[in-house]
From Swiss-Prot:
Record's protein name: Small ribosomal subunit protein uS14
Coiled-coil stretches: none
UniProt source species: Methylococcus capsulatus (strain ATCC 33009 / NCIMB 11132 / Bath)
Biological role: Binds 16S rRNA, required for the assembly of 30S particles and may also be responsible for determining the conformation of the 16S rRNA at the A site.
Keywords: Ribonucleoprotein, Ribosomal protein, RNA-binding, rRNA-binding
Amino acid sequence: MAKKSMIAREVKRQKLNGRYEKKRAELKSLIKGVETPDEQREAAIVALQKLPRDSAATRQRNRCQLTGRPHGFYRKFGLGRNKLRECVMRGEVPGVVKASW
């Protein structure tokens, strides 16, 4: 099980990302825009740099909902490989069966 502080940190990052997502997208479109004047582009770069680091989507790490494990994560189920296997074996994940050939 991951430390509670690590899980809390990820929750904080998700909240910050949600709060600043729209503003970050607007600033990035200004920066990437071909017709944007240089002064406005530089101001947008500075404004983007002043946003909190944890508000960037790349700072987020996918974690298992049950254990908080960061590796072996399956997006489709929101679980780590260990807990996914346990849930599948108990029949809690509909439509998923153990491979047999």
